[in-house]
Amino acid sequence: ESGEDFYDPYFFISVDCYCTGAIPPSHTRRDLFPGAVAFESLHASRKDRFLMRDIPFRIEYKDQSYFDSLLHTGEAPEGAFRDTGTYMLYRLRHGTVAFKRSDWIDEARKDLDALNQDFWNMLRTAFQARMEHFLGDLHAAIAREDELFYLVSSSGFIRTACSVLFVINH
């Protein structure tokens, strides 16, 4: 539903910008969108948010070298998927390309498809362990009748289950 209603508070257009090196300062990026209002930049997380023609946009600047390292070695840095799960890989693989200056995205997708089964097994094992952790948290939340902890634990369980499904169906 929110995908069709621009005024739904959950609706926004999310853009991943894969880049190399340092990103330009926020004022330079803001100047690239002259019609934008309410521009805010989160430099620590390399994200910009703004409204253009009443449509909310979120741009996240992603370092190509991080993905190159992951895709060429098949090894993820410790905690690489802890907060995002496999969502970043899903977006890399299935996101719609609106603009590209090189064939990097095409090559990255080929590299993602070529990752060996050991990589996917490692991810599956890690995410299944997290699912078990969240399942234990759910049990504790039910036993203590803690609605907030139940909500947090169930969201973690569902998100991790989605990561397991992505890994299985990669």
Map each language-model feature to its residues.
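Short, surface-exposed helix-loop/turn micro-motifs enriched in polar/charged residues
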Residues: 7, 149-150
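Glycine/small-residue-rich interface belts in oligomeric ring/scaffold proteins
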Residues: 20-22, 26-39
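Conserved NTP/Mg2+-binding pocket subregion across the NTase superfamily
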Residues: 34-142
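A short, ordered amphipathic alpha-helix with a cationic face
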Residues: 124-128, 152, 169
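Short helix-adjacent coil turns
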Residues: 142-149
